[in-house]
Regions:
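Hydrophobic faces of well-ordered beta-strands that scaffold small-molecule active sites
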Residues: 1, 42-44, 117-119, 170-171
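Structural preference for long, well-ordered alpha-helical segments within the folded cores
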Residues: 34, 101-108, 116, 160
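Acidic, His- and aromatic-enriched active-site or binding-groove loops in soluble protein domains
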Residues: 62-77, 136-154
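Non-globular sequence segments
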Residues: 41, 47-108, 112
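Short glycine/proline- and charge-enriched loop/turn segments
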Residues: 12-16, 132-142
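The substrate-binding groove and active-site-proximal loops of carbohydrate-active enzymes
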Residues: 14-22, 87-96, 144-147
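Short, well-ordered coil/turn segments that N-cap beta-strands
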Residues: 33-42, 113-115, 165-169
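N-terminal capping/small domains of soluble enzymes
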Residues: 1-49, 98, 106
């Protein structure tokens, strides 16, 4: 699957699926069962839209990103097409919660019987935005680059990881 939000605030586009509530887990369980009945496998792609979003597509929730920079272009909503709003820059102490959203969604995927999880890290969505000097103007960018190259980001996102210290490492 593609473009599945790990939290309500992670939704970007209209009518995209999530995998973070019990009802969503049950829905994905039905999908996984149908795929497995045909001897197939299914992997969910977790995508937190970050700044590539509009509040109208997520019940008024504000968009968040590493820095307060609007994405270029427009977002289609049920009310029409609008420029992307400027997202709220997350505070350093919120980063661990964003990581935990991905971990929770991965656990939900396991509970739903899905065969794997992929984290979407491109197109200036949240993960990509944190890793790019064009969209992350925060002072700790060098720390994130080091974490990426050492594999620590993947370790922090892994369910059951004992090495999820994003708040400590980025603070």
């Amino acid at each position: 699957s593609e473009g599945t939000q790990p939290s309500a605030v992670g939704q970007g586009y209209l009518n995209t699926p999530g995998i973070h509530t019990p009802a969503q887990v049950e829905g994905w369980r039905r999908v996984a069962d149908a795929v497995h009945a045909e001897r197939g496998r299914i992997v969910v792609q977790l995508m937190h839209a970050g700044r590539v979003a509009h509040p109208d597509n997520k019940d008024g929730l504000e968009s968040v990103a590493p820095s307060a920079l609007a994405a270029p272009g427009e977002m289609i909503t049920a009310q029409g097409s609008f420029p992307h709003p400027v997202p709220r820059a997350v505070e350093t102490d919120e980063v661990a919660g964003l990581v935990e959203d991905f971990v929770h969604a991965a656990r939900c995927a396991v509970a739903a019987g899905l065969d794997g999880v992929e984290v979407h890290g491109a197109h200036t969505y949240l993960v990509c935005a944190f890793l790019s000097p064009m969209t992350n103007l925060r002072e700790y960018l060098r720390v994130l680059t080091t974490l990426l190259h050492t594999g620590s980001i993947a370790t922090m996102l892994a369910p059951g990881s004992r090495n999820r210290r994003a708040g400590e490492l980025l603070g």
